Structures are given as C-alpha cells and as structure tokens.
Amino acid sequence: MNEQYQHRARKRFGQNFLHDAGIIDRILRAINAKAGEHLLEIGPGQGALTEGLLGSGAQLDVVELDKDLVPILQHKFADRSNFRLHQGDALKFDFNQLGVPPRSLKVVGNLPYNISTPLIFHLLSHAGLIRDMHFMLQKEVVERMAAGPGGGDWGRLSIMVQYHCRVEHLFNVGPGAFNPPPKVDSAIVRLVPHEVLPFPAKDHLLLERVVREAFNQRRKTLRNTMKGLLDSAAIEAAGVDGSLRPEQLDLAAFVRLADQLADQQQA
C-alpha cells in the first residue's frame, strides 16, 4: 500500500484487519452478492471484503467510523460507480436513508467485537428492511446467538436474535487470519430475518424487558427474578412454571410471559 495511505489498527475501535485470502473468498461465497442487489458493509477497514463485494456488481454502501480510513477507502475505490461511503458510527446510522425496499438490504461486516452486541440490536430494530446479514464476530458471541434453551449460552442475545431471525453458525476463523491477531477465535454467522415471526409478541419492547429482567439474575427461579413485573399467578396464567430458571424456557414461553405483561398493563 502507498505509504501515504498506511494505517495501523486502532485498539479503541476494536480493529483487527482481515487478510487471509482463503477466508475472504469463503465469506464472499457465503454472502453471494449479485448485480442489482443493495449491500451495506459495516466497518470495511482497509477494504478486504469491499473489493469482492464491488466486483459482484451490487450497489455497496459502507459505514466507517475511523476518519483516518476514509481517504484510504476513497482512494482505493474512487473509480467504482457502485461504491458509496458514509463516515460515522454504525450504532447511530439511519438505515432508512438508503431508500431500499422492505426485505432487500444485505448487511455484512467484520464487526468490532467491543460493539458487536449493541450493533446487532440496532440492526434488529431495522429487520423489516433486511434480507440477510453476514457477520464476522467473536466465536463466543456466535455460539450464544445460535444456542438453544437449557444451556449456559442461552440468554438475552439468543432469544432476541432468534425472535427476529434464523441463525446459522457457518464456520470458525482462527486469529491468524487477522492483523493484528485477536486474542480470541472468530466465527461467521448468517442471520435471516423471518418473513413471518414464528412467535409474534403483542409488544416486542415488553418482550425485551421481560427477557432482560429474567436474565439479570439467571441462577434464580422465574418466580424470584420476575417478581418486579409478574407475580406467581401471572406466570402460571402464561402457562409457565415459576420454579424454572430463565435458561430452561424457550422463546415461545418468553413471548407468553411478555403477552401476559401486555394484558396486565391494559387491564
């Protein structure tokens, strides 16, 4: 790279730049971008995935927080008519400004691990615009997203992601694929928003509240952890055993608890 455009990864931005050509190719094949599609890449870094995504002929918008990377990306992709760069924080990005039809946007990114969970929740609030998402994340985070009830990985992230999306843990990526190498293993996840929610809640914000309350003290029984929102009778009325711990409940049970709370608030 031209010395004028050299850039060191910044710890405060959680930057680890992907450089393994084999992994890059595998990710691009999983995304399977095509001409006529609209993609959004979050945190393009030095453009490892960007090059291949643009080569598909798809329209590509990228959001990059690091101001020092902006001239590097602008210089590298200046001749690409299907490239548009937004400098800013993806956590504050308004996806509606892209003007895409419902269920059409493909979102991709090697997400900074220090903001990956809040960023996923921000994206879920725009799930109606999104066709699919492919992310590089900390392996542990992907395992939590894809977890099922009954284990230690099942929690707020699993439930809220699976409420909105089908989750596929595609493959793992070792530290050597990055510069500098992170201290943890990574993984690629595919999230596909449901066309029809399998367990629609009356109020998804109440579902988030119920799930957060339940897992604040995950080792306690529901009867104890939920007492600020629902008493024992209300839990039973939702068809849920109050003596269970939160990790023993599936998504459908949490939706029933949230709906019980919604009914209680309207009474």
Curated annotation (Swiss-Prot):
Superkingdom assignment: Bacteria
Function: Specifically dimethylates two adjacent adenosines (A1518 and A1519) in the loop of a conserved hairpin near the 3'-end of 16S rRNA in the 30S particle. May play a critical role in biogenesis of 30S subunits.
Positions that bind S-adenosyl-L-methionine: N16, L18, G43, E64, D89, N110
GO molecular function: 16S rRNA (adenine(1518)-N(6)/adenine(1519)-N(6))-dimethyltransferase activity; RNA binding
Protein name (Swiss-Prot/TrEMBL): Ribosomal RNA small subunit methyltransferase A
Alphabetical list of Pfam families matching this protein: RrnaAD
Family the UniProt entry places it in: Belongs to the class I-like SAM-binding methyltransferase superfamily. rRNA adenine N(6)-methyltransferase family. RsmA subfamily.
Top-tier EC class: transferase
Compartments it resides in: Cytoplasm
UniProtKB keywords: Cytoplasm, Methyltransferase, RNA-binding, rRNA processing, S-adenosyl-L-methionine, Transferase
